[in-house]
Amino acid sequence: MKKYSGLLGIISAPSGAGKSTLINALQKNDSILQIKLSISYTTRKKRPGEVHGKDYYFISIEEFQNMINQNMFLEYAKVFNHYYGTEKNSIKLMLNSGVHVILNIDWQGMNQIRNKKLDFYTIFILPPSQKELEKRLRFRGLDTDQVIFDRMKQAMNEISHCKEYDYIIINDDFNIALIYLQSVILSKQLKIDYQEYHNSNLINNLLSCL
């Protein structure tokens, strides 16, 4: 598998599990982990408060298709009739420069990256129950019953792939889930193979003193 100076992590979850809120909190309290969230491209319209280039790169279907034709995506998928994709070169540049990159993508994108034989780790965020998941989806009060039904169906399909991931975090208590998420990412940075790659001189010098 291809190894980079930085670590690549993938976080997935069904809509309503609290993934985006957890990732935002992760970035705000990031004095130790030093991670960077990849910004995806999407064909869906901007929601109130979203900023182009910060939340997503909002592009047309034609532009997205051109990027597919030019093999510019590391992964892409169609979700709720909209396309989402991760641009390839920007990720490789960040990883090569030692940046720890987090991808906020679904199981389809995760499997596409797995097929590319890259070195990465995966985390799946679960809701505490199906009832709580539906409650969270209804909380915004903007969607019809049919839309909620479709989102629940999609969410359960997403959940069916959770065992394909390295780690599972249940988002029942937000603060605890955030600690778990931070702990998983930090543990990857402290693994022996990563430490040997980045601190080989120090480790070898200390061992030579034995």
From Swiss-Prot:
It comes from Blochmanniella floridana. The keyword Zinc does not apply. One of its GO terms (molecular function) is guanylate kinase activity. SUPFAM superfamilies: P-loop containing nucleoside triphosphate hydrolases (SSF52540). Its main location: cytoplasm. It catalyses: GMP + ATP = GDP + ADP. GO terms for cellular component: cytosol. This is Guanylate kinase. Pfam families: Guanylate_kin. Its EC number is 2.7.4.8. It is an enzyme of class 2 (transferase). The lineage of its organism: Bacteria, Pseudomonadati, Pseudomonadota, Gammaproteobacteria, Enterobacterales. Keywords: ATP-binding, Cytoplasm, Kinase, Nucleotide-binding, Transferase. Essential for recycling GMP and indirectly, cGMP. Residues 6-186 form the Guanylate kinase-like domain. It is found in: Cytoplasm. Belongs to the guanylate kinase family. ATP binds at A13, P14, S15, G16, A17, G18, K19, S20. It comes from the Bacteria.
